[in-house]
């Protein structure tokens, strides 16, 4: 970001804003995502970059959904998805669909979220773009539980699948998320020791980033399980 601003190259700044916003989204830093997304929207409108112009609404919508404005967030994410499709760009679509599914989850619309995730998982399978597959399965499990407590067996299977894929990818942050979701389910089922023993070694692997939402959530759950 600093270098892009120093050289005042619009396209480089556009790329820097996008990847900064994406990084903040991975870290679940909602306000930072919104700030980067809104800054990118202004730049992209000024410069007329069709591809990058789709980024602003997409990530701003995700941030709004996490700040009590889920309906507006869904509308913005949907707008961003349409703008991406108009450019013909398909790479990254499973991740973008995951943002929409998560917003539907916040809105309490589990059926709509599951429909979106089915599309995302199908795309991941057909295109081979699997880097966000652990999160897709984790979200699917969460939405199944939101839909009905009767779905706990299927949800647990989704969490296990997310965990296995994350381990195979050596994606520790996604492994932590999947493990936290599975451990939370086990806690609700009365399997407190199993939940603790699963989550503790994953959490203890980290040596930094303890200010991030995922690590805070994992630590809070471990404290409950202690």
Question: For each predicted feature, which ranges?
Answer:
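Helix-coil-helix junctions within alpha-helical repeat/solenoid scaffolds
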Residues: 1-226
């Amino acid at each position: 970001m600093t270098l892009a601003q120093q050289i005042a190259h619009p396209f480089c700044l556009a790329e820097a804003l996008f990847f900064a916003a994406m990084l903040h989204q991975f870290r679940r830093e909602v306000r930072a995502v919104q700030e980067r997304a809104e800054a990118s929207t202004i730049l992209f409108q000024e410069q007329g970059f069709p591809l990058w112009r789709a980024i602003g609404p997409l990530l701003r919508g995700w941030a709004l959904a996490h700040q009590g404005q889920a309906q507006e967030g869904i509308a913005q994410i949907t707008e961003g998805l349409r703008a991406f499709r108009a450019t013909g760009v398909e790479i990254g679509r499973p991740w973008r669909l995951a943002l929409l599914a998560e917003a539907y989850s916040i809105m309490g619309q589990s059926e709509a979220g599951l429909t979106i995730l089915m599309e995302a998982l199908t795309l991941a399978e057909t295109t081979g773009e699997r880097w966000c597959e652990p999160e897709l399965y984790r979200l699917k499990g969460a939405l199944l539980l939101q839909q009905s407590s009767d779905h706990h067996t299927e949800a647990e299977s989704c969490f296990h699948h997310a965990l296995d894929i994350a381990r195979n990818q050596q994606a520790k942050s996604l492994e932590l998320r999947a493990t936290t979701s599975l451990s939370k389910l086990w806690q609700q089922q009365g399997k407190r020791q199993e939940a603790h023993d699963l989550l503790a070694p994953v959490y203890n692997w980290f040596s930094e980033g303890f200010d991030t939402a995922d690590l805070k959530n994992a630590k809070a759950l471990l404290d409950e399980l202690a």
